[in-house]
Amino acid sequence: ASDVYKRQDVIIGQGTSCKELIEEYGFFDHIIVPIGGGGLIAGTALAVKYFGDNCSVIGTEPLEVDDAYRSLISGKIESNSTTNTIADGLKTQLGDKNFPIILKEVKSIIRITEDEIIESMKLIWQHLKIICEPSCSLPLAGVIKNREQFLGKKIGIIITGGNVDLKNLPF
């Protein structure tokens, strides 16, 4: 079940989170999501294509585990040489079914440092009162890191997952 993100039905199902976001809040300039195996961002990209009205999809992933970033540049699936990140939900390899969607529909990918991951997770916990896992804090970190790019824009971020192992937190 660890490669479930590669299944087309799962990719489409994950896109419903974006569809619901658009239905609830209207159109966005950008929707930002974390990238691990690529199912969520591929599903989001498909939803934006059909429901998003000129919205761009931007991915976020850990700097140390940046296979999607490198794959988007090279045009082929790249591997990681390390899985050294607190964002353990994003250590998975991109799937072959979702990569063509990512390549065609994703505008860019922002790489996030470990410190940025931790700081954005703390902000979500403290200010939104949402217990999210480190992997899910990357979209907020991407907005903070590139605040000038997003200034005056309507941004949607998808925060998923609350699987937190308190023993592994660095604070």
Residue ranges, per PLM feature:
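Short, small-residue-biased leader/transition segments that mark boundaries at the very start
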Residues: A1-Y5
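Active-site-adjacent helical/loop segments in soluble small-molecule enzymes
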Residues: G95-G152
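Glycine-rich phosphate/pyrophosphate-binding loop at beta-loop-alpha junctions
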Residues: K6-K104, F150-L151, I155-F171
